[in-house]
Amino acid sequence: MMMGKEDLGLSLSLGFSQNHNPLQMNLNPNSSLSNNLQRLPWNQTFDPTSDLRKIDVNSFPSTVNCEEDTGVSSPNSTISSTISGKRSEREGISGTGVGSGDDHDEITPDRGYSRGTSDEEEDGGETSRKKLRLSKDQSAFLEETFKEHNTLNPKQKLALAKKLNLTARQVEVWFQNRRARTKLKQTEVDCEYLKRCVEKLTEENRRLQKEAMELRTLKLSPQFYGQMTPPTTLIMCPSCERVGGPSSSNHHHNHRPVSINPWVACAGQVAHGLNFEALRPRS
């Protein structure tokens, strides 16, 4: 049986693992097979009772053949089964590791350590952001200095910091904040003043608009022309009035209106006077 398989030179191996891996077939022709095929004629038929069996590669092998072949399987099938077994063991270990709580216990200290570090950093940031506490004497002295000079040069900063037992940076920050507060207060005062000016100008604008509307109404009304003063009148002197004759009116003799053209009136009065002189008798 074994010799017949060696002559045939075909080794069929089917490895079945626990994980039902796909069928693996190893067809390796040997040199003896090529020699035997060269010796045999092509029209020769094989005896089915002989030791040499026909193997149809395209058909699925029977159970008996599989059982016989598994006993003489190639080393590749052994290696594949070993690899599949290791793979199953590895999967089982990984599955138990995921479900266990040991990993969570190992991560927890790291998280706690990271939280502790962040808490320490936050505490350090809070201490660095603490406000400067000044005494009443220090505040009063700084206010007096600010009234004299709202800005300081480096020498003045060092001298003031040494005198008040502070650092130059603290003095500089205090002056910056004080200037900012002063500017803010001045801005608020200017804003209030501008608001009052705007309100006053708004009222004045409303008053002027009202007066302009009243003037337009009077200009368009017809009574405006009736209330106008009469045109210019001439006043005659008493002597001319006596020469001209008695007035038809008994009152307002001194304010009798005459013609608008003064030259015509004067010419008539002169001519009238000359007539009287001509009629006067000569002595």
Curated annotation (Swiss-Prot):
One of its GO terms (cellular component) is nucleus. Signal peptide: none annotated. Its main location: nucleus. Residues 127-186 bind DNA. GO terms for molecular function: DNA binding; DNA-binding transcription factor activity; DNA-binding transcription factor activity, RNA polymerase II-specific; sequence-specific DNA binding. Residues 194-215 are annotated as: Leucine-zipper. Residues 73-84 have a biased composition (Low complexity). The keyword Ligase does not apply. This is Homeobox-leucine zipper protein HAT2. It comes from Arabidopsis thaliana.
